[in-house]
């Protein structure tokens, strides 16, 4: 049987039949059909496998009530009035980077309360 004949036979099979063929090949030859995964590095590989635990809090739009948003940004970041105003006026801007999920969601909720649009990345 040639490769073309084998491929032709595989094209005519259903997904269930193909799955059975793959399992039979794995058993027969002692191999796995799983794609090989490149080893990136201990920390990076572990972080990719887990659910994302750190987020960047990004102010995407200040909304209509900029004064309240500026006050909220000052409160959440500890910045001065001038710096907070520059961030709000220059949206989209990152407010905080690598923040724990719970803190990021809390920041997002507080900013949304005063009319700002916030993204967690």
UniProtKB/Swiss-Prot annotation:
Signal peptide range in chain numbering: none
GO cellular component terms given for this protein: cytosolic large ribosomal subunit
Keywords: Ribonucleoprotein, Ribosomal protein
Transmembrane parts of this sequence: none
Recorded GO MF terms: mRNA binding; structural constituent of ribosome
InterPro entries per the UniProt record, alphabetical: Ribosomal_bL12, Ribosomal_bL12_C, Ribosomal_bL12_C/ClpS-like, Ribosomal_bL12_oligo, Ribosomal_bL12_oligo_N_sf
Domain of life: Bacteria
One Gene Ontology term from the biological process aspect of the record: translation
Subunit annotation: Homodimer. Part of the ribosomal stalk of the 50S ribosomal subunit. Forms a multimeric L10(L12)X complex, where L10 forms an elongated spine to which 2 to 4 L12 dimers bind in a sequential fashion. Binds GTP-bound translation factors.
Function: Forms part of the ribosomal stalk which helps the ribosome interact with GTP-bound translation factors. Is thus essential for accurate translation.
PANTHER family: 39S RIBOSOMAL PROTEIN L12, LARGE RIBOSOMAL SUBUNIT PROTEIN BL12M
Family: Belongs to the bacterial ribosomal protein bL12 family.
This protein's name: Large ribosomal subunit protein bL12
Organism: Clostridium perfringens (strain 13 / Type A)
